[in-house]
Regions:
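A short, Trp-centered hydrophobic/proline-enriched beta-strand micro-motif
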Residues: 18-26
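A short core secondary-structure module
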Residues: 49, 53-97
Length: 201
């Protein structure tokens, strides 16, 4: 949405083909996911680029990504919505330190530190200092996608469980014929339908 034609031509074909992966680095240790609470700074340099200093928390799949879209403060104070910019930062630049770890759901995330990391001026996505509304929309879309994924997983688990109870026998009868099992399956089905209803609304 913010990329110019040059950035789209450089990155979109590689992203579509799967040859390149991006991740979004926006959360910080002190922010507790308040999107406007940004301490990571990007200062313009004399050559038209930016020098990035700061840290990002819980960056999903940072270690396996080729580049990061990083929210940085280019002006204003810590809690101001105005003054936040997005920079497209290749992962292999000097000064980037990635501390990767496994999350509770088996994914990978990382703490990422930027120490005087220099990017060119064309790393800026959109207008300088005007990225907050885009970050907000991206987060909302991401949350919706995760909810859809979780609802789909619930559907698979419910159907697999129902199928298993029909195949598995106990006391010479399928488990699905036992009332206590039927009650549990109904509970699973109702919880799945409630989640699907919330998602579609």
């Amino acid at each position: 949405e913010l990329a110019n034609e040059e950035q789209k031509n450089d990155w979109l074909p590689k992203l579509i083909s799967g040859d390149c992966q991006l991740t979004f680095a926006y959360a910080e240790e002190q922010s507790r996911f308040d999107l406007e609470d940004v301490l990571t700074r990007a200062k313009p340099d004399e050559k038209g680029g930016f020098i990035i200093d700061g840290a990002k928390s819980m960056v999903l799949h940072a270690a396996s990504a080729d580049a990061m879209i990083v929210s940085c403060r280019t002006s204003g104070g810590q809690y101001e919505k105005k003054g936040i910019s997005l920079l497209l930062v290749p992962k292999d630049l000097e000064g980037i330190n990635i501390d990767s770890f496994e999350t509770v759901d088996g994914q990978r995330a990382a703490e990422v530190r930027f120490e005087s990391v220099r990017v060119e001026g064309n790393a800026l996505l959109g207008r300088e200092g005007d990225a907050f509304s885009t970050i907000e929309r991206a987060q909302q879309s991401g949350i919706l996608a995760l909810c859809a994924e979780a609802t789909g997983i619930m559907e698979c688990l419910y159907k697999d469980t129902a199928s298993y109870t029909q195949d598995r026998e106990q006391f010479d009868r399928p488990m699905s014929e036992f009332q206590v099992i039927q009650h549990r399956l109904v509970d699973m089905f109702m919880e799945y339908e409630q989640c699907k209803s919330m998602l579609l609304r």
